UniProtKB/Swiss-Prot annotation:
The gene is hisD. It is an enzyme of class 1 (oxidoreductase). Gene3D superfamilies: 1.20.5.1300, Nitrogenase molybdenum iron protein domain. The lineage of its organism: Bacteria, Pseudomonadati, Pseudomonadota, Gammaproteobacteria, Enterobacterales. This is Histidinol dehydrogenase. Its EC number is 1.1.1.23. CDD domains: Histidinol_dh. NAD(+) binds at Y130, Q188, N211. It comes from Shigella sonnei (strain Ss046). The keyword NAD applies. Binds 1 zinc ion per subunit. GO terms for molecular function: histidinol dehydrogenase activity; NAD binding; zinc ion binding. SUPFAM superfamilies: ALDH-like. Pathway: Amino-acid biosynthesis; L-histidine biosynthesis; L-histidine from 5-phospho-alpha-D-ribose 1-diphosphate: step 9/9.
Length: 434
C-alpha cells in the first residue's frame, strides 16, 4: 500500500483496522541468534583477543589500544566547532534540569504505631552505554544516557562504540564526565560489557540502541545468569501524528519524514479527521522527500506507513492508544486538551512548535523510548532506570507486639510454620521479659 493512499478508518472492517495498526515484523533470524551466541561465548572465553579479532573482521579496523586515551579525547574536542560544542552544552543543561527534577523524595512513614517503613533510592553501581557508529554517529545518545547516569550517582560508567570513534561521540563523553571509553562495537561490545574482559569492565546494566546483532546480544545477555540487565526491548523507530484542519501540512510532513529517515523498518502514521489535511500532507511529504539525502531510506519506510482519516479527534486518540507509538505528535488547535486521554505513548509533542526533533536533541526529555507497542507497559528512559529502590522496616517492641497476632494468623493460613515461629518465639521472649 502506497503512503499516498488515504484510508477511511470507518470504512474498514475490524480485521482491516487491526492490519493497519500492525508494525513491520521484527525477529532475529536463526543465523543472527546463532552468530550472536557464538560471539558472546567467544568474548567471554577469550576476552580482549576476541574483541580485536572482531574489530578486524566486522569494522575492518586494527585496534591496538581498546581504551581511548584522555589525550585522544582531548584531541577530538579540539577538532570540533565551537558552535557544535555550545549546542551540546545547551542540550546537556536541559537534559540535566529535567532529569534532576525526577529525583524521588524519600518515603518514611509509620504504617501503625511502632511500625516504621521507608523507601530509599540507590544508584545502579555500574552501567554500560552502547553508542552506534557509522556514517551518522549518534552522539546525542551519549548525552541522553550519560547525563542521568551522572545525576543518579552511578559509580562506574563505561562507553563502547565501534572504531574509529567519531570526534562528536568522544567530546560528548568528555562533556558528560565519562572517562572509560572503549573502541568496541557490535554484539562483541555487549558481550564485553556483560561479562568483562581484561580491558573492559563488567557492568550491571547496559543501555543504548543498535542494529539487529546488538539488539539480539542485549536480549541474550539479559537472560544469562552471568550477564547484565538491559534498559528496554528495542524495535524500529516510529511516530504517530494527530492533526486537525488547523495544522500546518509542511510541519506534519517534516515530522513524519524525520522518523522515516531513521531506517527502512521505521513506521509513520497520520491520523486526522480532515481528508483535505491528509491530501495536503501527502503532497508535502513528496515535496520534502525529494530534497532529503536519505530519501531512499525514508521512501522504504513509507511503504509500511499510513494516512488515516477518522470521524473526529476522539477517534484519533482511541486509535493512537491502540497503537501506542514511540513518538506521538499532536498538532491540533487545542493540543493540550487531548493529553489526559492519551494512555500509551513514549513521548508526546504538543502543538506546532514542538517538533519531534526537539525531544531527540535538546528539550530535556529523553529520546530513548519504548517502541513496537511496548509503551503499553514500559516508560521512556529516565533517572529511575539508573537507580533502584530499596525498602526498610523497623518495628519497636510495642509495634511488633501489636502486629504479632496478625502476622501469625496470616502465616498459619499459608501453612508457613517457620514464618509463624519467627513471630511466636519473639512473642514468648517478650512474655518472659515482662
Amino acid at each position: 500500500m502506497s503512503f499516498n493512499t488515504i484510508i477511511d478508518w470507518n470504512s474498514c472492517t475490524a480485521e482491516q483496522q487491526r492490519q493497519l495498526l500492525m508494525r513491520p515484523a521484527i525477529s532475529a533470524s536463526e543465523s543472527i541468534t546463532r552468530t550472536v551466541n557464538d560471539i558472546l561465548d567467544n568474548v567471554k572465553a577469550r576476552g580482549d583477543d576476541a574483541l580485536r579479532e572482531y574489530s578486524a573482521k566486522f569494522d575492518k579496523t586494527t585496534v591496538n589500544a581498546l581504551k581511548v586515551s584522555a589525550e585522544e579525547i582531548a584531541a577530538a574536542s579540539e577538532r570540533l566547532s565551537d558552535e557544535l560544542k555550545q549546542a551540546m552544552a545547551v542540550a546537556v543543561k536541559n537534559i540535566e534540569t529535567f532529569h534532576t527534577a525526577q529525583k524521588l523524595p524519600p518515603v518514611d512513614v509509620e504504617t501503625q504505631p511502632g511500625v516504621r517503613c521507608q523507601q530509599v533510592t540507590r544508584p545502579v553501581a555500574s552501567v554500560g552505554l552502547y553508542i552506534p557508529g557509522g556514517s551518522a554517529p549518534l552522539f546525542s545518545t551519549v548525552l541522553m544516557l550519560a547525563t542521568p547516569a551522572r545525576i543518579a550517582g552511578c559509580k562506574k560508567v563505561v562507553l563502547c562504540s565501534p572504531p574509529p570513534i567519531a570526534d562528536e561521540i568522544l567530546y560528548a563523553a568528555q562533556l558528560c564526565g565519562v572517562k572509560d571509553v572503549f573502541n568496541v562495537g557490535g554484539a562483541q561490545a555487549i558481550a564485553a560489557l556483560a561479562f568483562g574482559t581484561e580491558s573492559v569492565p563488567k557492568v550491571d546494566k547496559i543501555f543504548g540502541p543498535g542494529n539487529a546483532f546488538v539488539t539480539e546480544a542485549k536480549r541474550q545477555v539479559s537472560q544469562r545468569l552471568d550477564g547484565a540487565a538491559i534498559d528496554m526491548p528495542a524495535g524500529p523507530s516510529e511516530v504517530l501524528v494527530i492533526a486537525d484542519s488547523g495544522a500546518t501540512p509542511d510541519f506534519v510532513a517534516s515530522d513524519l519524514l524525520s522518523q522515516a529517515e531513521h531506517g527502512p523498518d521505521s513506521q509513520v502514521i497520520l491520523l486526522t479527521p480532515d481528508a483535505d489535511m491528509a491530501h495536503q500532507v501527502a503532497e508535502a511529504v513528496e515535496r520534502q522527500l525529494a530534497e532529503l539525502p536519505r530519501a531512499e531510506t525514508a521512501r522504504q519506510a513509507l511503504n509500511a506507513s499510513r494516512l488515516i482519516v477518522t470521524k473526529d479527534l476522539a477517534q484519533c486518540v482511541e486509535i493512537s492508544n491502540q497503537y501506542g507509538p514511540e513518538h506521538l505528535i499532536i498538532q491540533t488547535r487545542n493540543a493540550r486538551d487531548l493529553v489526559d486521554g492519551i494512555t500509551s505513548a513514549g513521548s508526546v509533542f504538543l502543538g506546532d512548535w514542538s517538533p519531534e526533533s526537539a525531544g531527540d536533541y535538546a528539550s530535556g526529555t529523553n529520546h530513548v523510548l519504548p517502541t513496537y507497542g511496548y509503551t503499553a507497559t514500559c516508560s521512556s528512559l529516565g533517572l529511575a532506570d539508573f537507580q533502584k529502590r530499596m525498602t526498610v522496616q523497623e518495628l519497636s517492641k510495642e509495634g511488633f507486639s501489636a502486629l504479632a497476632s496478625t502476622i501469625e494468623t496470616l502465616a498459619a493460613a499459608e501453612r508457613l510454620t517457620a514464618h509463624k515461629n519467627a513471630v511466636t518465639l519473639r512473642v514468648n521472649a517478650l512474655k518472659e521479659q515482662a
